[in-house]
Amino acid sequence: MFIDLTPEQRQLQAEIRQYFSNLISPDERTEMEKDRHGPAYRAVIRRMGRDGRLGVGWPKEFGGLGFGPIEQQIFVNEAHRADVPLPAVTLQTVGPTLQAHGSELQKKKFLPAILAGEAHFAIGYTEPEAGTDLASLRTTAVRDGDHYIVNGQKVFTTGAHDADYIWLACRTDPNAAKHKGISILIVDTKDPGYSWTPIILADGAHHTNATYYNDVRVPVDMLVGKENDGWRLITTQLNNERVMLGPAGRFASIYDRVHAWASVPGGNGVTPIDHDDVKRALGEIRAIWRINELLNWQVASAGEDINMADAAATKVFGTERVQRAGRLAEEIVGKYGNPAEPDTAELLRWLDAQTKRNLVITFGGGVNEVMREMIAASGLKVPRVPR
């Protein structure tokens, strides 16, 4: 069976590709290389909101365009292909989870603001002492009248330095089994008890943070779903996040740039793509890109019924293979390019930044070692590793 996009989906893809091709100014792109969540990022997302582009995969009843999950993947892939940042956590995980489990007040307050590019969320799950074992989290939320009082610390909270809200996992019942006593609260980052410190990663950019909650007051109506039923929301949100971490557009971006560079003779008169090893490397990158695209379509099309093992497998494949694609690209550009030539130097700089940035996603949404355990236990029914 040959699986491909319909003519209508191809048309949508072309429209989105054209839209993204001139969305970002050079100054905005330069600023976002150092801070992916600052003023330039905000301006770009608001622009997409004004243009009605953020709701491609959202149902019309929530203000979206009413397309399906494949069209949403097209949107995400084309954004990554053009190196355009998206409010991915907000748009693709928090938004859909609120649509399914949020109160009417929460839907009315947050969903239109998300589609307008005005509301930005960060995910507060990981803790210094718990790591990927989310069920061992210690951040507490104690009921006090019509508020919860939150105390604790999170780490690797991406975008928290610029977020309007934190989607926070808290322990609301210390006596319950560790998976049972967790709730999800929406924390307003304007609360005086909220603070953060930056964590600068390998690419030199400010993506993520440690976040602190010191007697933060959260209104009871900012509890998502039922109290102590947060684990179900966490797994729903994380399954969606894992699919979005390995979009095929990451591969397409590498392929497009390196293929274009390799097709032009260098200063020495040699055209890199004439060499067999360059053709092999580009062929492998293109093949990985296509496989990842098909995996994303398959898993995304499951919608709310997304399988945990499938989401984890997609995440592992995409995040690890994009590392290989980056290494293959750097090898051929380093071998056949001259760093003294501006185009080659810029491509090498870009590839280095991409490789370092893509390293981060191997542990976003759960480290890949844990993902493999989930694939084995949930997908292959292999007994879990004793701890």
UniProtKB/Swiss-Prot annotation:
For this protein, what reaction is catalysed?
3-oxochol-4-en-22-oyl-CoA + A = 3-oxochola-4,17-dien-22-oyl-CoA + AH2
Tell me the domain of life. Bacteria
Induction data = Induced by cholesterol and repressed by KtsR.
Active site (UniProt): 241
> What EC number(s) would the UniProt record show?
1.3.99.-
Indicate the transmembrane segments per the record: none
Q: How is the cofactor bound?
A: Binds 1 FAD per heterodimer.
Cited InterPro entries:
Acyl-CoA_Oxase/DH_mid-dom, Acyl-CoA_Oxase/DH_mid-dom_sf, AcylCo_DH-like_C, AcylCo_DH/oxidase_C, AcylCoA_DH/ox_N, AcylCoA_DH/ox_N_sf, AcylCoA_DH/oxidase_NM_dom_sf, Mycobact_Acyl-CoA_DH
A GO biological process held by the record: biological process involved in interaction with host
- Copy the pathway line from the protein's UniProt record: Steroid metabolism; cholesterol degradation
GO molecular function list = FAD binding; oxidoreductase activity, acting on the CH-CH group of donors
UniProt xrefs under Pfam families:
Acyl-CoA_dh_1 (PF00441), Acyl-CoA_dh_M (PF02770), Acyl-CoA_dh_N (PF02771)
Keyword tags: Cholesterol metabolism, FAD, Flavoprotein, Lipid degradation, Lipid metabolism, NAD, NADP, Oxidoreductase, Steroid metabolism, Sterol metabolism, Virulence
Q: Does the keyword Ribosomal protein apply?
A: no
Q: Where does FAD bind?
A: 123-126, 132, 158, 367-369
Could you say which cofactors this protein requires? FAD
- Recorded family membership: Belongs to the acyl-CoA dehydrogenase family.
Quaternary structure and partners: Heterotetramer composed of FadE28 and FadE29.
Q: What does this protein do?
A: Involved in the third cycle of side chain dehydrogenation in the beta-oxidation of cholesterol catabolism. Contributes partly to the virulence by increasing the efficiency of beta-oxidation. Catalyzes the dehydrogenation of 2'-propanoyl-CoA ester side chains of 3-oxo-4-pregnene-20-carboxyl-CoA (3-OPC-CoA) to yield 3-oxo-4,17-pregnadiene-20-carboxyl-CoA (3-OPDC-CoA). Also able to dehydrogenate steroyl-CoA such as 3-oxo-chol-4-en-24-oyl-CoA (3-OCO-CoA), 1beta-(2'-propanoyl-CoA)-3a-alpha-H- 7a-beta-methylhexahydro-4-indanone (indanone-CoA ester), hexahydroindanone and pregenenone.
Q: What is this protein called?
A: Acyl-CoA dehydrogenase FadE29
Organism of origin? Mycobacterium tuberculosis (strain ATCC 25618 / H37Rv)
